[in-house]
Each structure stands twice: as structure tokens, then as C-alpha cells.
Regions:
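GNAT-family acyltransferases
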Residues: 1-125, 138, 142, 178, ...
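Amphipathic alpha-helical recognition patches that constitute DNA-binding helices
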Residues: 112, 130, 147-149, 158, ...
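Conserved beta-strand-loop-alpha-helix junction that forms the acyl-donor binding cleft
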Residues: 118, 150-160
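Conserved acetyl-CoA-binding loop-helix of GNAT-fold acetyltransferases
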Residues: 124-138, 161
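Conserved GNAT acetyl-CoA-binding A-motif
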Residues: 141-151
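Conserved catalytic-core motifs of GNAT/GCN5-like acyltransferases
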Residues: 151, 169-183
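Conserved active-site alpha-helix within GNAT-family acetyltransferase domains
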Residues: 156-172
Length: 220
């Protein structure tokens, strides 16, 4: 188990996903369905409940750490507003040879960031940039992972360009990788950032936030 975790910045709070978030997530996902061409985003209470329950099953097994993405001050009268989801997934603890210098206990060696979606109004805001900064900072500086990976539909040229802009490197194309959000068999573009690259990536993300740059960075 690697959670539950709460990660908080100036614009966003990532809090442990639970079934109480379902009504707010349904509302967030209903605002503009055209935003979800490349990432599966449940529609309606039944689908959203099943989605969250599946996430919680993966959390309980230690495979995922799932968050509700909360935009601070994004709701009526400056209240906080649930605007989407994201996760640590593909969490692996490597089996090192006995006595290996890199052997650690209780933390992962590599992780993915995925299952990311946001409401339409939360896109092109600092929310996703800060969420990625919070998650990568935790992964590299608290867990001290060797690699963070991100992937997106190979056709999602906008997200691919955004990942490359912050320093993600294309590791390869995974053919027939998973179900696509558009009822196709998805081919994925897989990117990674390794620990030696993290300082430059962190600086780029921090600069994007400071400059108010809000180009999309939402792999899944």
C-alpha cells in the first residue's frame, strides 16, 4: 500500500478518491463530453460509481493510488470544486538481488501517471500542470522512484507535444495496447522521465505555472 495520499498546491488539491466524490464527478464529466475523445470518462451516476469502485479495488490491492482532483476556489463563492480524477498506476517494486545497494522497502521503484481527466472549464488552467508537478515531486522526491511514465493515445498529438515540451522522452509505441475511448483498439505512445531528468522537468513545470502557461498535459 502506497496511500492514501493528499497532495496540495496553490491551485489544486489531490485527495484520496472515494464514493462520496461520485456526484461531483458526474457533474464535472457532464459539462462538455467533446473533451473526452482520447480518455475514457464515465457518463452518469451508474458508470461513475462503477469507475470509482474499480479504482478503489485497485487501490486496495496496492496497484493504484487514485485521486479526486479538486480546484481550490473553483466553485461558487470561492468554494473548492471537484473537477476530475488522476492516479498513480503501474506501480512496481523491483526485486533486486540480495544485498543490492538500490534495494528499498515500502516504496515503489517506478510508477505511471494516468487515468487523468478534467472538466472542460478546468482545462487550459493551472490545475493539470500543478497536479503533474505535485505527483512527480512526490514520486521522485518522497518515493525516490527511478522513472515516471506517461502515455496517451498515439493520435492525441496535442498531449504528445505537451509531454515532450516538459522533457518527457518517447520510449515507444505500444500497438493494440488497450480499449480506446472511442470504441477502437488503442495504440499508445509511451513517454518517460527518469530521475536524472527530473530537475529540468521540475523547473519547466514550475516556470509554466509561474507564467500562467496552460497548454494541455493530460495523458492517460
Amino acid at each position: 500500500m502506497f496511500g492514501p495520499l493528499t497532495l496540495e498546491g496553490a491551485h489544486v488539491r489531490l485527495e484520496p478518491l472515494n464514493l462520496d466524490h461520485v456526484p461531483a464527478l458526474v457533474e464535472a464529466a457532464s459539462e462538455d463530453r467533446s473533451n473526452y475523445q482520447w480518455v475514457y470518462t464515465p457518463a452518469g451516476p451508474e458508470q461513475m460509481t462503477a469507475y470509482v469502485q474499480d479504482a478503489l479495488t485497485k487501490v486496495a490491492s496496492g496497484d493504484h493510488v487514485a485521486f479526486a482532483t479538486v480546484r481550490k476556489g473553483g466553485g461558487p463563492s470561492g468554494s473548492d470544486l471537484v473537477v476530475g480524477c488522476t492516479r498513480f498506476c503501474e506501480i512496481f517494486v523491483w526485486q533486486w538481488p540480495p544485498g543490492a545497494t538500490h534495494q528499498r522497502r515500502g516504496v515503489p521503484d517506478v510508477v505511471d501517471i494516468g487515468f487523468t481527466w478534467l472538466s472542460g472549464p478546468a482545462q487550459r488552467t493551472p490545475v493539470n500542470t500543478e497536479a503533474k508537478l505535485l505527483m512527480m515531486t512526490h514520486a521522485f522526491e518522497t518515493w525516490k522512484v527511478h522513472r515516471v511514465a506517461l502515455q496517451t493515445d498515439v493520435r492525441n498529438t496535442r498531449s504528445r507535444a505537451a509531454i515532450e515540451r516538459i522533457g518527457g522522452r518517447l520510449d515507444g509505441i505500444m500497438r493494440a495496447d488497450r480499449p480506446g475511448a472511442d470504441d477502437t483498439v488503442r495504440t499508445s505512445a509511451r513517454f518517460s522521465i527518469v530521475v536524472s531528468e527530473w530537475p529540468k522537468v521540475k523547473a519547466r513545470l514550475t516556470a509554466r505555472l509561474a507564467a500562467g502557461t496552460t497548454r494541455p498535459l493530460s495523458p492517460s
